[in-house]
Amino acid sequence: MTATNHPKLFKRPVDGVLLLDKPGGMTSNEALQRVKRLFHAKKAGHTGSLDPLATGLLPICLGEATKFSQFLLEADKSYSVKGRLGVRTASGDSESPILTERPIPKLTKRALEKTLFAFRGVIDQTPSMYSALKHKGQPLYKLARQGIEVERKTRQVTIYELTLLDWDNESIELYVHCSKGTYIRTLLDDVGEALGCGAHVVALRRLRVAHYHEDQMIKLAHLEREYDKANYTGLDRYLLPLETMVSHFPAIKLSSSTAFYLQQGQAVMVPNAPTHGFVRLRDQNDQFIGIGEILSDARIAPRRLIQKR
């Protein structure tokens, strides 16, 4: 009997980040719940959904790691995406009805690069009706499935890199490095319209989230093979420390007294601290205890602190 079908599981406090390689055909929440059961975790969350058809990097936060998930939600991300040309669909992927079919013009690398150039930098996107954004409390995709369409506000996103990887008479493959909130399905749909033939996503893989990359990913099938009901803590070796989630912030070492007051919720002065932004907090033993923020008066206020076990 595996952790995924065991009727009653002992749940424990376990902290860390798992860089899951989400398989295709599974929702992000389904993947999350399976990982949560495998680790017997009391608390778990992910840091930004992937579409069911998508594969790749889905950071799973266990225990105290959930306190820092916002920093990965707000991080840049990278993808490889393959699109079919000549066919536009309602959702921008292969899992919804076809809207239009048009002939594909003769494409050259020069013409493709010229089209892609317009989508680099800061661009406006109108989210698809088949997205998790909410309208009056209802996810847009649920409204779309009822045949209801509502007006969506455009949003600005940044495409840091948009590289043509491959193309042929029917498809195009791109590498995308983008800011938070970028809809890859919408991006490919817009590129297809700019080419005059339409396009939709047939394969999508997330390669990076912040500084985490695909070489660090663990497959769900591997975890399930490694799972041992009698020694489930054996999977803990795949968890990364909490501090890796915020390693891009400068670190501040605290004295025992300043660490004490911060942990009581009080803002403190720390010599030679940065003048603005978030900082990693380390106690007198050089142990990570959480994240603080520099206030306008130069004091450091606690923002996310780890609960000591």
Swiss-Prot record:
Keywords: Isomerase, tRNA processing. It comes from the Bacteria. Pfam families: TruB-C_2, TruB_C_2, TruB_N. InterPro entries: PsdUridine_synth_cat_dom_sf (IPR020103), PsdUridine_synth_N (IPR002501), PUA-like_sf (IPR015947), PUA_sf (IPR036974), tRNA_psdUridine_synth_TruB (IPR014780), tRNA_sdUridine_synth_fam1_C (IPR015240), TruB_C (IPR032819). Coiled coil: none annotated. GO terms for biological process: mRNA pseudouridine synthesis; tRNA modification; tRNA pseudouridine synthesis. The active site is at 51 (nucleophile). It catalyses: uridine(55) in tRNA = pseudouridine(55) in tRNA. Its EC number is 5.4.99.25. GO terms for molecular function: pseudouridine synthase activity; RNA binding; tRNA pseudouridine(55) synthase activity. Belongs to the pseudouridine synthase TruB family. Type 1 subfamily. Responsible for synthesis of pseudouridine from uracil-55 in the psi GC loop of transfer RNAs. NCBIfam families: TruB (TIGR00431). This is tRNA pseudouridine synthase B.
